[in-house]
């Protein structure tokens, strides 16, 4: 290849000398003697064009280099002004024309020792005058230059042309089959100026000529005009050189070498073309393979993408089908469970119905067994009475409680009919019926009642035989006894509810036959002081029951039991025959003390029950025997019967208001005295109000609060708590209602930071009573047997904790007898005596102590020992007094 040769023969011409000289071999692309350049000179721009490039591409590269050269020229012209053209010629044209002609001196041939054969210029390919002129003018045709002077690949020509001529140059397409056409050419065009050309002309010499070394691509460089002129003289033929025999021999030799070199160049060019063709084919095959691989890769990616999409669709379809199957399975399972649940529900309902039927049968059997002893005797049915046929009505049965109405509702007597006849005869036509209507005085006529005939039978007559010592005769009272049942509601009136929001006691639900003349629907808030006493607070008389034992531990034990069975068991307990009970069941605490009396009572009750069952006596509601009304012209027998029930009215003066005020002030003073004695026991006490009231009443009965009986109180405290001394006659024990009212008004049961839950008396009450320094908890010494347990179920710190006896303890719910829930009439002695737990019930005089006064009048005991007690009710308008001798 021409570009890879180490060096070549370079033909260099100079204006000063044309002698040949030997130059040293040099490496490619290395300048041995670089030409020094001025700092102001611009570097030459070399354009390398490969040999296989077409002329169109080479022209494009040349045009681009020309554009760069024009830009450089513009930059240079900006710095130095360009001289103006004279007669259409610039300084370059003048410079080329004024170039020196070739001298007659023998030309110097430069021989490169690195080449096999030296290539020199000969006369066979000289540049004639016409070509020189065209080269000088810049109009050298490439075709002509190549035909006249073919160049080898190792040759380098330096041509200097101006920019204008290069722009106007045209490079036609070269044919590769011509042997004299070069493989490729490159021109390096550099911008120059006249000043630069002059400097290079003066600085050029024979030893230091500018040498252009051919590269691997064998470029053609266009250098300065001095090199161009030198090449002209070198390539040109002179008369002296053409006539010498040495030049002929050299030209023959060089032509042979040139031909040989040309053959080699053609061979290399052919090989190069083959290699280029093979390279192009390989590149085309490579591009085709690359395109094929890219197509295959794109196809694979496309197939992979489609496969992935197809798999995703199949997977989504599978998931959808799976979800649908799962949903269907769930629906089927739910339907199956629903069906199973319905079957179980139906089965459970059937079992429940069956169990209820069996339960009803069992209950009926038990009731039949229980009521077998209490069956009523069947009474013979009365003969049915039928009414006779009258008019349109057929005969019908007259049942009990029915009466047949007469044909005429009014039964006329003979006297009434005679009076009617007289009125009919004496009537006149003067008075009109219309006049009576105009008077607007309608006459009233009451309801006609059907006369009832009381049929008195022997069984329905109640005979009361009694010998009255006053009348001295037996009196028989007959009354028709009504059917056994609930009293008629018409007789007692409606049930009424009396309830107020301020009251703590339960409301009243019952009948009330009293009617007020003051209170009516127009005045519902009026006060009837004659019938009601508005000063009496009924809440004070009401005693709330203490909270019972907690049954939370027993809750849920009998939840599985049938409630109907429990009712049956309770019913069975009521029908247990007498004598069947155990010794300690159904007996009160008082009866436990005497077992003999207990046995006697049980025997009497069993006998009474047997007699009642044997005689089949009916238990019915008692009805009073009403006698009256008694009029002045009544019979003497009725008056004599009712005479012993007559009431005597005592005349007494009216109650003065001052007396009422004195009583209220006296009550306040008494309440203050009681409170002063109650505060030491109440303040700081952890027990309940019932225990405190019981302890205070016991202290009052023993007279511990009397100031003049201190020694007596000391003796009583030293005695045993079980002993119950007699209450002095001059001591009044306050009632439970009064004590509870005082406790609730003057204290509060709460928890404070300094102590736990206990009673705290108000600070103003303590200051008023001058008892501010009372300890908390209280240091009271109890005289009764109490279990000091607070509402928190904690033991009291101040009180002495004493245990109750076994008889006073509360019995468990399982061993409670039935008679505990039944009312029992107490004798007067049991009401006065103390119970087993040490609590004495309040008497009637003690409860009504606020509203009553006890007047004692002790007369001379020697003459007559009698005491008169008068109980006066101050709240009623009438004063009733009862005296006892």
Swiss-Prot record:
One GO term of the biological process aspect: nucleosome assembly
Compositional bias segments (type: Polar residues): 116-128, 134-157, 182-193
Biased composition (Acidic residues): 536-548, 557-573
Record-linked Pfam families: CAF1-p150_C2, CAF1-p150_N, CAF1A_acidic, CAF1A_dimeriz
Comp. bias (Low complexity): 12-21, 211-227, 237-254
Region (Necessary for homodimerization, competence for chromatin assembly): 629-665
Gene Ontology CC: CAF-1 complex; nucleus
Cellular localization per UniProt: Nucleus
Subunit structure: Homodimer.
Function noted in UniProt: Involved in chromatin assembly in DNA replication and DNA repair.
Protein name, per record: Chromatin assembly factor 1 subunit A-B
Gene behind this protein: chaf1a-b
């Amino acid at each position: 290849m021409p570009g890879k040769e180490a060096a070549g023969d370079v033909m260099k011409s100079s204006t000063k000398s044309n002698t040949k000289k030997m130059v040293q071999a040099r490496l490619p692309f290395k300048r041995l003697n670089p030409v020094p350049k001025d700092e102001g000179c611009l570097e030459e721009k070399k354009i390398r064009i490969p040999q296989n490039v077409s002329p169109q591409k080479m022209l494009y590269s040349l045009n681009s280099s020309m554009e760069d050269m024009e830009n450089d020229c513009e930059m240079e012209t900006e710095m130095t002004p360009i001289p103006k053209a004279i007669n259409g010629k610039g300084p370059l044209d003048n410079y080329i024309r004024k170039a020196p002609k070739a001298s007659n001196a023998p030309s110097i041939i430069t021989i490169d020792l690195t080449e096999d054969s030296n290539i020199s210029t000969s006369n066979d390919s000289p540049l004639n005058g016409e070509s020189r002129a065209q080269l000088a003018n810049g109009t050298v045709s490439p075709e002509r230059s190549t035909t006249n002077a073919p160049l080898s690949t190792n040759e380098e020509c330096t041509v200097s042309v101006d920019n204008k001529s290069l722009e106007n140059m045209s490079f036609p397409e070269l044919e590769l089959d011509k042997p004299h056409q070069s493989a490729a050419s490159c021109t390096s065009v550099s911008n120059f100026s006249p000043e630069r050309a002059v400097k290079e002309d003066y600085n050029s010499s024979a030893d230091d000529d500018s040498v252009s070394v051919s590269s691997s691509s064998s470029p053609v460089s266009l250098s300065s005009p001095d090199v161009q002129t030198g090449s002209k003289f070198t390539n040109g033929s002179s008369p002296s050189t053409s006539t010498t025999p040495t030049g002929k021999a050299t030209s023959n030799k060089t032509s042979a070498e040139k031909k040989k070199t040309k053959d080699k160049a053609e061979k290399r060019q052919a090989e190069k073309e083959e290699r280029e063709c093979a390279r192009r084919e390989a590149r085309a095959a490579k591009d085709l393979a690359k395109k094929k691989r890219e197509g295959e890769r794109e196809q694979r990616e496309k197939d992979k993408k489609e496969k992935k999409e197809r798999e995703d669709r199949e997977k989504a379809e599978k998931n959808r089908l799976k979800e649908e199957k799962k949903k269907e399975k769930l629906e089927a399972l739910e339907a199956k469970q629903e069906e199973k649940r319905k079957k179980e529900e139906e089965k459970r309902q059937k079992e429940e119905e069956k169990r209820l039927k069996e339960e009803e049968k069992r209950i009926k059997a038990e009731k039949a067994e229980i009521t077998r002893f209490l069956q009523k005797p069947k009474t013979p049915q009365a003969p049915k009475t039928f009414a006779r046929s009258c008019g349109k009505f057929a005969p019908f049965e007259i049942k009990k409680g029915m009466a047949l109405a007469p044909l005429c509702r009014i039964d006329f007597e003979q006297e009434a009919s005679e009076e009617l006849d007289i009125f009919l005869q004496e009537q006149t036509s003067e008075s009109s019926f219309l006049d009576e209507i105009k008077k607007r005085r309608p006459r009233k006529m009451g309801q006609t009642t059907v006369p009832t005939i009381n049929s008195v039978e022997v069984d329905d007559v109640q005979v009361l035989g009694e010998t009255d010592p006053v009348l001295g005769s037996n009196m028989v009272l007959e009354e028709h006894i009504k059917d056994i049942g609930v009293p008629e509601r018409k007789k007692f009136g409606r049930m009424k509810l009396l309830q107020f929001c301020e009251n703590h006691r339960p409301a009243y639900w019952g009948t009330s036959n009293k009617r007020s003349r003051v209170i009516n629907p127009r005045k519902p808030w009026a006060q009837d002081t004659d019938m009601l006493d508005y000063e009496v607070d009924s809440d004070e008389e009401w005693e709330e029951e203490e909270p019972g034992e907690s049954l939370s531990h027993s809750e849920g034990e009998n939840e599985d039991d049938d409630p109907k069975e429990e009712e049956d068991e309770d019913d069975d307990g009521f029908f247990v025959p007498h004598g069947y009970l155990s010794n300690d069941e159904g007996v009160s605490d008082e009866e436990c003390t005497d077992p003999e009396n207990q046995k006697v009572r049980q025997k009497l009750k069993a006998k009474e029950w047997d007699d009642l069952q044997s005689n089949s006596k009916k238990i019915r509601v008692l009805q009073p025997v009403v006698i009256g009304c008694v009029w002045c012209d009544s019979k003497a027998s009725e008056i004599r019967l009712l005479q012993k029930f007559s009431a005597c009215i005592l005349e007494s003066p009216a109650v003065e208001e001052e007396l009422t005020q004195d009583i209220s002030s006296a009550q306040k003073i008494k309440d203050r005295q009681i409170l002063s004695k109650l505060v030491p026991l109440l303040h700081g006490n952890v027990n309940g109000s019932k225990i405190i009231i019981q302890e205070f009443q016991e202290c009052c009965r023993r007279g511990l609060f009397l100031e003049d009986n201190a020694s007596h109180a000391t003796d009583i405290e030293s005695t045993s708590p079980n002993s119950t001394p007699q209450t002095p006659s001059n001591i009044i024990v306050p009632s439970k209602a009064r004590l509870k009212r005082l406790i609730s008004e003057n204290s509060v049961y709460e928890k404070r930071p300094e102590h736990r839950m206990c009673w705290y008396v108000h600070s103003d009450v303590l200051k008023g009573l001058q008892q501010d320094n009372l300890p908390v908890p209280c240091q009271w010494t109890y005289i009764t047997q109490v279990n000091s347990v607070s509402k928190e179920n904690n033991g009291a710190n101040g009180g002495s904790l004493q245990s109750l006896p076994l008889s006073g303890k509360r019995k468990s719910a399982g061993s409670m007898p039935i008679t505990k829930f039944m009312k029992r009439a107490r004798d007067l002695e049991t009401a006065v005596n103390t119970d087993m737990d040490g609590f004495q019930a309040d008497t009637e005089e003690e409860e009504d102590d606020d509203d009553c006064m006890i007047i004692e009048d002790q007369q001379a005991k020697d003459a007559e020992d009698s005491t008169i007690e008068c109980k006066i009710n101050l709240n009623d308008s009438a004063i009733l007094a009862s005296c006892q001798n």
